[in-house]
């Protein structure tokens, strides 16, 4: 509960009891207040116990090729996007290290825009990049943002997520990475400016301009809207790397109109049509983003463009098995903890990939497919000591048969079948 001065009704520090007139600052928290003197005392205690943290530096920045090689361990395909990201991130942190030493040339910030369909790996690339560099990372959804003063989330709340990711170490957060997803959803409805207020489209783009370029932002520590009696966290966004991503559905048509070429094989040849659309996507330019509905000032603060392609069946199968944190490996490990071996046949993996393509969910849908199929297995195995091995076949994925349970006595059990000798 808040503490009040009974005579004057003033707010008081919840720790030492001093009123706001007796201290220089009174910082508001969720239901409590703390004065600057108590903050200083707490800070001294923490520093004595933990020691002063070293200044955040990036002296040993991985080279672009090293970054790409690490990304290969976690993300399948998308080599073009990996190269663009690796170079941009390397240059960004090299620029931070240069600091103010280059008096003759000012090194500009290189924020990144990623264009690619749902489930192509945009979020995973950004997450992996932050893990490679060991920097704070935050994800935001552009569709939840609105212009200040309207119902929704202020853009400053994105910065709060980054500060929270850095355990409220502002200096560390100032060198972090923010990924804003669904950026295409805040495109204005037409290329021409509207006379009506677009609070979740162009208004949000305008609000994002300053933090993308670099400014000292005031962030409410409790989140939500700014209100009186609230002390703000000051954070400099100059060295924060912003990566924005979106599907930009239909941008191929914008590119096609610009280059004046038709999509070849649009008829029945699905493969040619998709390959040609991906080729068009690879040719996307900043002017195409403007035609799509992003304002020129916003595009200008995203100088690096990386395009991702739709994942085919082969790539989805590799995603299931090859990365260090591959889904199949995770489930194999999960059953291994119950002393049971799990095996997916090659045909089963292909069926999972086909189902993800059919659902148009890309790599993002792989986990939900396996979760659905593994539910009965994960429910049954812990309660049975006689199961030695579980085999998932293509018929398991298509629903024609259940998983095969190889028992410790050598027999095989399958849903709907009688026991048979292995």
UniProtKB/Swiss-Prot annotation:
InterPro entries: AAA+_ATPase, ATP-dep_Clp_protease_ClpX, ATPase_AAA_core, Clp_ATPase_C, Clp_protease_ATP-bd_su_ClpX, ClpX_bact, P-loop_NTPase, Znf_CppX_C4
Function: ATP-dependent specificity component of the Clp protease. It directs the protease to specific substrates. Can perform chaperone functions in the absence of ClpP.
Keyword Cytoplasm: no
Alphabetical list of SMART domains matching this protein: AAA, ClpB_D2-small, zf-C4_ClpX
Keywords: ATP-binding, Chaperone, Metal-binding, Nucleotide-binding, Zinc
Summary of subunit composition and partner proteins: Component of the ClpX-ClpP complex. Forms a hexameric ring that, in the presence of ATP, binds to fourteen ClpP subunits assembled into a disk-like structure with a central cavity, resembling the structure of eukaryotic proteasomes.
Family, as annotated: Belongs to the ClpX chaperone family.
Organism from which the protein derives: Exiguobacterium sp. (strain ATCC BAA-1283 / AT1b)
HAMAP family referenced in this protein's UniProt entry, alphabetically: ClpX
Residues annotated for Zn(2+) binding in this entry: 13, 16, 35, 38
Protein name, per record: ATP-dependent Clp protease ATP-binding subunit ClpX
One GO CC annotation: HslUV protease complex
Any Gene Ontology biological process: proteolysis involved in protein catabolic process
Top-level lineage group: Bacteria
Highest classification ranks of the organism: Bacteria, Bacillati, Bacillota, Bacilli, Bacillales
Keyword check for Disulfide bond: no
Binding-site list for ATP: 117-124
GO molecular function, a single term: ATP binding
Boundaries of every ClpX-type ZB domain copy: 1-54
PANTHER family per UniProt: ATP-DEPENDENT CLP PROTEASE ATP-BINDING SUBUNIT CLPX-LIKE, MITOCHONDRIAL (PTHR48102:SF7), ATP-DEPENDENT CLP PROTEASE ATP-BINDING SUBUNIT CLPX-LIKE, MITOCHONDRIAL-RELATED (PTHR48102)
Any matching Pfam family: AAA_2
């Amino acid at each position: 509960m808040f503490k009040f001065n009974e005579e004057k009704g003033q707010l008081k520090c919840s720790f030492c009891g001093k009123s706001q007139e007796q201290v220089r600052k009174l910082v508001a928290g969720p239901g409590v207040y703390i004065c600057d003197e108590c903050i200083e005392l707490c800070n001294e205690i923490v520093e004595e116990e933990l020691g002063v943290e070293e200044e955040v530096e990036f002296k040993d920045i991985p080279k672009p090729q090293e970054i790409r090689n690490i990304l290969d361990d976690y993300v399948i395909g998308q080599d073009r996007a990996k190269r663009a990201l690796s170079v941009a991130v390397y240059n960004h942190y090299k620029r931070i290290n240069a600091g103010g030493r280059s008096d003759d040339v000012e090194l500009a910030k290189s924020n990144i825009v990623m264009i690619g369909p749902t489930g192509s790996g945009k979020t995973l690339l950004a997450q992996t990049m932050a893990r490679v560099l060991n920097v704070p990372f935050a994800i935001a959804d552009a569709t939840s943002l609105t212009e200040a003063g309207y119902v929704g989330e202020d853009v400053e709340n994105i910065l709060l997520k980054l500060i929270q990711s850095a355990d409220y170490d502002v200096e560390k957060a100032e060198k972090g990475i923010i990924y804003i997803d669904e950026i295409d959803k805040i495109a204005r409805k037409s290329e021409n400016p509207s006379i009506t207020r677009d609070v979740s489209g162009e208004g949000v783009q305008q609000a994002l301009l300053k933090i993308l370029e670099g400014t000292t932002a005031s962030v409410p520590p409790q989140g939500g809207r700014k209100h009186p009696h609230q002390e703000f966290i000051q954070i400099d966004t100059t060295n924060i790397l912003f990566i924005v991503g979106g599907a930009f559905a239909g941008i191929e048509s914008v590119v096609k109109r610009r280059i004046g070429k038709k999509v070849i094989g649009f008829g029945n040849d699905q493969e040619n049509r998709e390959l040609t659309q991906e080729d068009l996507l690879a040719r996307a330019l900043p002017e195409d983003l403007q035609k799509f509905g992003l304002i020129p000032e916003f595009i200008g603060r995203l100088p690096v463009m990386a395009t991702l392609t739709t994942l085919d069946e082969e790539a989805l199968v590799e995603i299931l098995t090859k990365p260090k944190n591959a889904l199949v490996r995770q489930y194999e490990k999960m059953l291994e903890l119950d002393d049971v071996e799990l095996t997916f046949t090659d045909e089963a993996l292909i069926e999972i990939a086909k189902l993800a393509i059919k659902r148009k969910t890309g790599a993002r849908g792989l986990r939900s497919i396996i979760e659905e199929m593994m539910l009965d297995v994960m429910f049954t195995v812990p309660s049975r000591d006689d199961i030695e091995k579980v085999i998932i076949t293509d018929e398991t994925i298509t629903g024609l048969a259940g998983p095969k349970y190889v028992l410790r006595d050598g027999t095989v059990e399958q849903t709907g079948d009688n026991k048979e000798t292995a």
